[in-house]
Amino acid sequence: MESGTASAAKYGREQAWQLLAEWTESESLRKHARAVEICVSACGVAEADRLRLDSEEREKLLELYATTALLHDFDYERHPTLDEHPFVGVRELERLGWPTELRTAILGHAQYSGVPRVTHVDKALFACDELAGFLTACALVKPTKAIAEVEVAGVRKKMKDKAFARGVNREDVIQGAAELGVDLDAHIGFCLEAMKKRAGEIGL
């Protein structure tokens, strides 16, 4: 019988990254996955602190948040239609034995899936997905293309500009913060700080 440690290792961050890389050649999609991972992982740290988890439980929670974020769009490059994404990917994850919590969160991040967001990781993924993409776009229009120059006020101003980053659903950003039970400006600032701390990992 496989031990819990061995099983966890089989579905850890390294394995998630390998699967993402196998299915996704686009560097921008890989960077998006990493940006979402950074934001969702920061939410995971805050949740672990709130729950006062011991080291073992904390590690498990953070692994779940990181892997869920990395894999949320792993099938998008091959299956970008609403009929296929994220359903094809989730079926593959089920075949490979990835945890139910991860698969449910990935289904839930797509509004059209009909899967409700119940757990904190479900809500964190939805709240960070579109926002991470928007924050990246805000950084890339800066002369230095550095997220260090992006501030909350500037992000809110850009959100009102419908011509900017048209692909980002502003309503999802607003709804995501509401579902997490946090103020929108606070959530934007929280994700900005997380991305600024690890900017080198995503080329910003």
Could you tell me what each predicted segment is?
Residues 25-30, 36-57, 71, 122-204:
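Divalent metal-dependent phosphate-bond-processing catalytic cores, especially two-metal-ion Mg2+/Mn2+ enzymes
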Residues 15-18, 111, 175:
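Residue-identity detector for glutamine
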Residues 1-82:
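Acidic/His-rich, divalent-metal-binding segments that scaffold phosphate/diphosphate chemistry
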